[in-house]
Amino acid sequence: MNLDVPYYRLGNHEKVEYIPLKLALNDDTASEPQQFSEPVHKMPINDMVGYDNTTSNVSAGIIILISVVAFIALFLLLYVIYYFVILREQQQYSDSIDTDSPFVFNKFD
């Protein structure tokens, strides 16, 4: 069974009927009478007694801790790159030669 349809047969001659969104939705609530005069609570008032803000305090503390750790890690990474890459590539020249050092080659010749 072949379901391929050539593009010339998929023309746009079919008319699409639709309802404009402005007419489909009724946003005029001011003209309608209100059925509920009192506010509707989604959570009973008795259940809200045990609610406190500790979870947001803990999450704020975790965010601060993670940001401090990330800052320290970034600082250490930049210091390691500076120390092992940038400082090691610079050639260090000395104007004076230490002849008393035992590491000088051919000292005893």
Swiss-Prot record:
Keyword Transcription set for record: no
Compartment annotation: Host membrane; Virion
Keywords tagged on the record: Host membrane, Membrane, Transmembrane, Transmembrane helix, Virion
A GO-annotated cellular component: virion component
Superkingdom of this protein's organism: Viruses
Membrane among keywords: yes
Spans through the membrane: 61-81
Database matches in InterPro entries: AcMNPV_AC78 (IPR009261)
Topology in the lipid bilayer: Single-pass membrane protein
Main location as per UniProt: host cell
Function, in words: Plays an essential role in budded virus production and occlusion body formation.
Name of protein: Protein AC78
Organism: Autographa californica nuclear polyhedrosis virus (AcMNPV)
